[in-house]
């Protein structure tokens, strides 16, 4: 449904205390099952303030899981078919910073330099949001969030490694570069092996942060999987994901593996 507001515009400024994208981009209605987006230039903040001092009181689970959400943004925008040179550079730097600095912020919460590095990485991961599109991990996350009430950071923690593995046959070269940014020693490895190593490295990083890694940990049951798979398939559009998804059953297999 489209409409045109006639209200007097109000400038928006946001101060983000976590690492997700809500401070810059998201206006979503989740009062009903699923998600409904609202978009207008006047909704875009004129100013976004990144102050690591403000994040000191952010709950650890929220900080860590939204950090993985930012990693999900960067990974999916790097291997999307619509990737661009500018977004490639920013996404790889985001991956490098998040994998290196996010654990530091958990072990040494007072390290403001590490916190700022994570904030910058999350910002980098959002560039080109409407050109370099996200793929299957985000599509599944939308349904898990809207239908099952799972916070988006936690959907990324559970789903991203499984989607990376699914996409490996179609995006091994890009996943190998992601692996290098994440600290994988790729010398002597085939592209396919480097891609698998990238997936394992991301999965280990998520587990080391203490984030959930199974759907059952976030309240999703086997009975939820079929409708989520169908709704995810309905959301996907050509060019969103590096590997084509032919039917909902392929998504269902990913969900079962993550259960």
Where are these regions (language model features)?
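Flexible, polar/low-complexity N-terminal or interdomain linker segments that lie immediately upstream
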Residues: 1-40
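Internal, well-ordered alpha-helical segments in soluble enzyme and binding-protein domains
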Residues: 11, 48, 63-70, 91-94, ...
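A glycine/threonine-rich phosphate-anchoring loop and its flanking beta-alpha core
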Residues: 21, 38, 43-83, 176-181
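Structural motif
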Residues: 26, 47-48, 69, 126, ...
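Fold-independent oxyanion-binding glycine-rich loops
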Residues: 30, 50-53, 58, 121-122, ...
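Buried hydrophobic positions in well-ordered alpha/beta secondary-structure cores of metabolic enzymes
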Residues: 51, 71, 118, 138, ...
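Active-site segments that bind and position negatively charged phosphate/pyrophosphate groups
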Residues: 77-201
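C-terminal charged capping/lid subdomain of soluble metabolic enzymes
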Residues: 175, 186-259
């Amino acid at each position: 449904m489209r409409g045109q507001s006639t209200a007097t515009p109000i400038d928006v400024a946001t101060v983000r205390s976590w690492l997700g994208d809500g401070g810059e981009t998201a206006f979503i209605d989740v009062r009903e099952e699923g998600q409904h987006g609202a978009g207008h230039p006047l909704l875009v903040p004129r100013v976004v303030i990144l102050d690591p001092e403000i994040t000191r009181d952010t709950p650890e689970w929220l900080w860590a899981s939204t950090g993985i959400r930012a990693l999900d943004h960067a990974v999916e925008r790097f291997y999307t078919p619509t990737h661009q040179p500018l977004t490639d550079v920013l996404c790889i730097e985001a991956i490098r910073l998040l994998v290196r600095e996010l654990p530091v912020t958990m072990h040494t919460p007072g390290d403001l330099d590490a916190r700022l590095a994570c904030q910058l990485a999350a910002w980098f991961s959002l560039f080109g949001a409407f050109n370099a599109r996200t793929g299957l991990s985000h599509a599944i996350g939308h349904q898990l969030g809207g239908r099952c009430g799972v916070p988006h950071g936690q959907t990324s923690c559970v789903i991203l490694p499984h989607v990376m593995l699914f996409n490996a046959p179609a995006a091994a070269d890009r996943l190998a570069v992601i692996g290098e940014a994440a600290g994988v020693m790729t010398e002597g490895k085939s592209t396919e092996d480097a891609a698998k190593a990238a997936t394992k490295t991301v999965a280990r990083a998520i587990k080391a942060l203490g984030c959930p890694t199974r759907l059952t940990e976030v309240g999703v049951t086997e009975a939820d999987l079929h409708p989520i798979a169908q709704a995810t398939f309905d959301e996907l559009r050509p060019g969103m994901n590096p590997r084509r998804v032919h039917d909902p059953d392929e998504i269902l297999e990913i969900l079962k593996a993550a259960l």
